[in-house]
């Protein structure tokens, strides 16, 4: 399953000491079973997430705070639906926290990005940023524990708090805190729709060349079928 691919990426990294898995409560029993079967040694807890991403992050941060994690600890937050994250991205995040208090994996955009605004009932182009400075955010996103908890404390007090990811929380609420860019990759795909399936199958085959084409395709279809089945239950 997708979540296992993501866990394994961090499980096999010697620099990662502990893993917390945040999942929808509906599938927590299944995830616990998969973790037990795989024998992951770094998973310390499987906890229920919230209705939105930021709620899930806060649940994990609260658990870490209760455990007495020091402010200087390095924390990496990853989308479990990015199962093809590379070791160099994980290492890059960890290394970046030696110099910065926040970092994110990102991939240089090959598309022109348009910033828009409302004009009546239509969206119109407000500006076109230089593409050399445009990146697509990926994960992991990395923080010193004290930095991300402080950002969330400030954000929680804001009634207009609606960020899309954890880096955005730091950028918005700790504007003087630089966030370093760690080189990502095109294969660090976020699997969210059926349209992502053929791309994910190709990536899976490239990572597992010993498997035949049809075998890899069948495996990925089974994974996605289960994932989408769970999504439709929500």
Which residues are covered by each model-predicted region?
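A generic "binding-loop/recognition-motif" signal
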Residues: 27, 80-81, 109, 185-187
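Residues at the starts of beta-strands that form the adenosine-phosphate
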Residues: 17-19, 101-102, 178
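Conserved beta-loop-beta/alpha segment of the NTase-like Rossmann-fold superfamily
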Residues: 51-119, 138
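Short, flexible, basic/aromatic active-site loop/helix in glycosyltransferases
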Residues: 115-143
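Hydrophobic packing residues within well-ordered alpha-helices of enzyme cores
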Residues: 31-32, 93, 200
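Conserved alpha/beta core of the MobA/IspD/sugar-nucleotide pyrophosphorylase nucleotidyltransferase superfamily
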Residues: 134-234
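Conserved N-terminal catalytic core of the sugar/cofactor nucleotidyltransferase
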Residues: 4-72, 158
């Amino acid at each position: 399953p997708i979540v296992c691919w993501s866990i394994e990426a961090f499980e096999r990294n010697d620099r990662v000491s502990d893993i917390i898995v945040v999942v929808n409560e509906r599938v927590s029993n299944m995830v616990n079973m998969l973790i037990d079967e795989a024998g992951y040694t770094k998973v310390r807890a499987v906890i229920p997430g919230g209705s939105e991403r930021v709620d899930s992050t806060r649940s994990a941060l609260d658990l870490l705070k209760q455990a007495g994690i020091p402010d200087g600890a390095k924390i990496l937050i990853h989308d479990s639906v990015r199962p093809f994250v590379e070791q160099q991205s994980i290492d890059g995040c960890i290394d970046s926290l030696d110099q910065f208090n926040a970092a994110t994996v990102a991939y240089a955009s090959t598309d022109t990005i348009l910033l828009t605004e409302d004009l009546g009932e239509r969206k119109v182009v407000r500006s076109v940023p230089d593409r050399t400075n445009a990146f697509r955010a990926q994960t992991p996103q990395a923080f010193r524990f004290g930095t991300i908890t402080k950002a969330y404390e400030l954000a929680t007090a804001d009634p207009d708090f609606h960020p899309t990811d954890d880096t955005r929380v730091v950028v918005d609420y700790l504007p003087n805190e630089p966030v370093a860019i760690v080189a990502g990759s095109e294969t660090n795909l976020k699997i969210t729709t059926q349209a992502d399936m053929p791309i994910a199958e190709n990536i899976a085959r490239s990572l597992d060349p010993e498997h035949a084409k049809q075998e890899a395709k069948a495996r990925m279809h089974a994974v996605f079928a289960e994932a989408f089945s769970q999504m439709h239950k929500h």
